[in-house]
Amino acid sequence: MRTIIIALSLLYCLHGQSEVRLSPLFTDNMVMQQTTDAPIWGITNTKHAVSIITSWDKKTYNAMPDKDGHFITHVSTPKAGGPYSITISDGTPITIDNVLIGEVWLCSGQSNMDFPVKGWGQTKNCDEELKNADHYRIRLLHVNNTMRPHAQTEFEAVGGGWQLCSAETVAGFSAVGYFFGRDIELNENVPVGLIESAWGGTPVEAWISSEFLSTMSDFKKATQRIINMPDDIPTRKHFYDEEITSFEKQLKNIDDNSVINADETCNRYLLPGLLTQKEFADFDGIIWCYKTIGIPHSWQNKELKLRLGMIDDNDVTYFNGKVIGRMDGYAENRVYSINADFVKEGKATIAIRIMDIGGYAGIVGYKDHDICIELDAENSISLNGEWLIKKTIPLADIPELPRNPITDAKNVCMLYNAMINPLVPFSIKGVIWYQGEDNVNRAYQYRELLPLLIEDWRKQWNNRFPFYIAQLANYHPKQKEPGESKWAEFREAQHLTAKHKDNVGVACLIDIGDANDIHPANKQEVARRLALLARAYNYGEQIESSGPVYNNHVISGDKVILHFINTDKGLTTSDGKTPRGFAIAGLDHKFYWAETEIKGNTVILWSPKVKHPIAIRYAWADNPDCNLCNSKLLPTYPFRTDDWPGMTLGNIAY
């Protein structure tokens, strides 16, 4: 067990005037993992032993503080039950009340895990769900978002600590986490504690410790940068300002485009929106967007606001050649102030240098109002409409962009340091993980990153706990013909992790996504499928926990016979029609849609265009049209029988 160091600024327990101070992990309404030796730690100003009395067995445990007052002991927890209390005393006792013993699950990842029951996102039937959200045996602990360059032992929690599950407390809590916990509480008849530690728009490498991430050659430099980063914000800002100055000098040498006027190489496109046109479809790098407007006389020498909404991915924005703002990350709304000294009557040019680091680029804007420049709420000029746009420097030719170490949660290791490390070694049953949209463009690299994270966390906890992955759901417009797909490659990376790691599972979500929304609303089904894995593998239920999985195949002439496992009572389709989503290729490696037939636990494939088949793919698309499932209507996992190099092979930029 690692040494626990508790900072003096940890939350004061509000149960009296004791000198003992505890983490938000140890508050009223907490849940402790059943039948284990659970650690309890804190800090005291005294030099003598701290006593911990557990009401379930009336046993007293003693812990000697070290020279700095830090203490830790382990208490033996019974089978699920409660409520109980824990009394901790260094001379003045404090009591943690309404403690339940049950199952504790950590819920982590990016925005689809952070997606609330009702808040910035809204789940399916959210109002009805909130009406029925009072669950005495479900407790919630929500870690506040924060990032630090070095491992922390303290954190802040929403509401200060554990909260009873209610319409009020669960509204802003992870929907996937809540629905998962509800399924476990109902089916296993145990109290459930849920810890949410998630942050939207974050890559997996932000959640890995520097100890582990530094072992990957792709991240040695980035990890060392964070290790060298000062902790205090003013010094960190100075550090970053120097990095940006150096970066801009390097970039100017290769991209000397005017920031005032567009030129003849520009084309006209409508904004706001993503640039999905063929010219930009496969381009990552620098894209310039220009808009000329007329500033009225009444606005002269007055401060203005430029409201651009979200931009994909990073931007530097100019007004008449002057930098007025910059921001990294597509999930942030841009609102930039324009200095009154820059504002003159007449023509003015807004120039935006977008750095696209993956997927489509664009000025995404707002859902409910125009992008605009404004004097005040009553006086604004819409910027919706035609912009002059051109691409310049591909990403591969751009010097590495330093990430803002104060505001950019994509920085390596920083979320582990601030949002995971402080939870260790609190006893947990396992982890559910919904993350990956931010790593899609590096799917092959993810084959190494996700297993690394799992090993990292298991080592820190000294516990090979179960780890269940939510496979990315279908997203983007459907494609008419078979082709390559970064999202399919990413799902493959997730599936390979589950295949090759012990006590790891993956829930297939290929049928419950939304073509137009990266945050599908049906979080109940996401959670149900994750809970099926836990119920089958950790709680001993004899249930079908997943959909069909490709096992092997036989080629017979111009036909291919595919064999599947996890078929329950046999293969079927979700809509009762012939299986769709299968593509077949011959020696030329060109895929065609296949004719299909189900026979028991096999699917027979053929195509008149492929006389000598050598490879099969199923659901191999961002948003595939597929329908094969088992008798429980759980979908078949996407797969391919080939190992031909994919679109993301070799992508390491982050």
Please provide the spans of the model-predicted regions.
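Ser/Thr-rich low-complexity repeats and stalk/linker segments
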Residues: 19, 25-103, 358-360
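Short beta-strands within extracellular/lumenal beta-sheet-rich domains
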Residues: 24-28, 283-296, 333-336, 417
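Surface beta-strand/loop "capping" patches
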Residues: 34-36, 281-284, 521, 525, ...
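Beta-strand-rich ligand-recognition modules
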Residues: 57-81, 310, 317-370
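Short, aromatic- and glycine-rich surface loops/edge beta-strands on solvent-exposed regions
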Residues: 81-91, 351-352, 614-620
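An acidic-aromatic loop/edge-strand motif
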Residues: 94-164, 195-277, 347-417, 421-426
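Aromatic-lined ligand-binding clefts that engage carbohydrates, nucleic acids, or primary amines
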Residues: 266-267, 293-321, 350-352
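C-terminal beta-sandwich/jelly-roll accessory domains of carbohydrate-active enzymes
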Residues: 566-654
